[in-house]
Design a protein with these regions (language model features):
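WD40-repeat beta-propeller superdomains and closely related acidic/aromatic-rich repeat-like regions
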Residues: 29-344
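Sec-dependent bacterial lipoprotein signal peptides
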Residues: 1-30
Length: 344
């Protein structure tokens, strides 16, 4: 009798779960489709293939790196090209670049050589062959600390190279065990690095030594630093956390239910307690902090399977500007998008 009851109970449980599933499917089917999110401004800068893109601090300028040694800067307000540098001035095998916050200076790099550019005059401001310092390693990331003379290089050997061309001083610090893929300077001037080893480091620039570290299980794909030393860290599989680097503690975690998903670019909103992320493609999500709940979702324009958001900046507290690998610049009213979602 007990056995019969158990079988009956299991069967009933299966029917109940099936009924719940059917009701859920019907409810989802009856749910009205959300209104499409439209940009409030769009401009296709180019239809040429892009290696890299960067926006200035408030999104007023866009720098694009093209194959075969071409580097160009546009004024996004006037939609005019300000700088157009070509090979052989730009080394043909240049594979990465960085623009300082003011858009006055650019860094570009091959595997071993860094070039510095003055965007106001479209003239080279310096060149540095780091082969001797790198050894068998190569450049994997770069960023100005104080443009144009002071900058930092991440390498495939896990080293951080602090360079100052004015004083001709170079310091190599080893902390990572794999490629250093992210370098970022916080609003208050703190330097952070992240690598394919899952290590995130907050650096003491004066002593060229780590102040705090955080380790996540997999390679770091997204790194963003906001106010109050709050750092967003996402790895390649399932870790998306807010790290308070001053106190070295995790203060929030995104409620992200999909495994094997990751983020590429992220920005903290300047006024609202929000974090905005982009997927490896063009999906955009607004997250409510500190709860870590998603409150809105939309997609930037994609013109192909490989389209992705390469950078984003707030032009003002309410407007986010994105630039994609298709050369498309779009503006988004973030408050309006959140309001449309019904979560704001």
């Amino acid at each position: 009798m007990v056995w019969v009851f158990s079988v009956w109970a299991i069967t009933l449980d299966r029917y109940l779960r099936l009924a719940v599933l059917l009701v859920s499917v019907q409810c989802v089917a009856c749910t009205p489709e959300p209104e499409p999110v439209n940009d409030i401004g769009r401009w296709q800068i180019t239809d040429s293939f892009i290696l890299s893109a960067a926006l200035s601090k408030q999104g007023q300028h866009t720098a694009l790196l093209f194959p075969q040694g071409r580097l160009a800067v546009w004024d996004n307000d006037t939609q005019k090209r300000l700088v157009d540098l070509h090979a052989p001035d730009v080394l043909p095998d240049t594979s990465m670049m960085h623009m300082d916050e003011s858009a006055r200076y650019l860094l570009s790099a091959t595997r071993t050589v860094v070039q510095i550019w003055d965007a106001t005059s479209a003239e080279p401001a310096g060149s540095l062959d780091l082969s001797a310092q790198l050894g068998d390693a190569s450049i994997t990331s770069l960023r100005f600390i104080l443009a144009p003379h002071s900058f930092v290089i991440g390498t495939s050997g896990g080293d951080i190279l602090f360079a100052d061309t004015r004083s001709d001083e170079y310091h190599l610090a080893h902390q990572h065990d794999a490629d250093v893929v992210k370098l970022i300077v916080s609003p208050d001037g703190e330097l952070y690095s992240a690598g394919n080893d899952g290590l995130v480091v907050r650096w003491d620039e004066q002593n060229k030594a780590p102040e705090q570290t955080l380790t996540v299980p997999h390679r770091v794909t997204s790194l963003e630093v906001g106010l109050d030393d709050n750092v967003f860290v996402s790895d390649a599989l399932e870790t998306q956390v807010i790290w308070q680097s001053q106190h070295n503690e995790i203060i929030s975690e995104l409620a992200y239910w999909e495994r094997f998903q990751w983020f590429r670019v992220a920005r903290f909103a300047p006024v609202n307690p929000w974090l905005i992320t982009s997927s490896p493609k063009t999906e955009m999500i607004i997250w409510q902090l500190p709860e870590g709940n998603p409150i809105a979702q939309w997609w930037a324009e994609a013109q192909g399977f490989g389209s992705t958001v390469l950078d984003m900046r707030f032009t003002n507290p309410a407007t986010l500007r994105t630039v994609t690998s298709d050369g498309v610049l779009q503006d988004w009213d973030i408050a309006d998008i959140a309001e449309q979602s019904g979560s704001y």
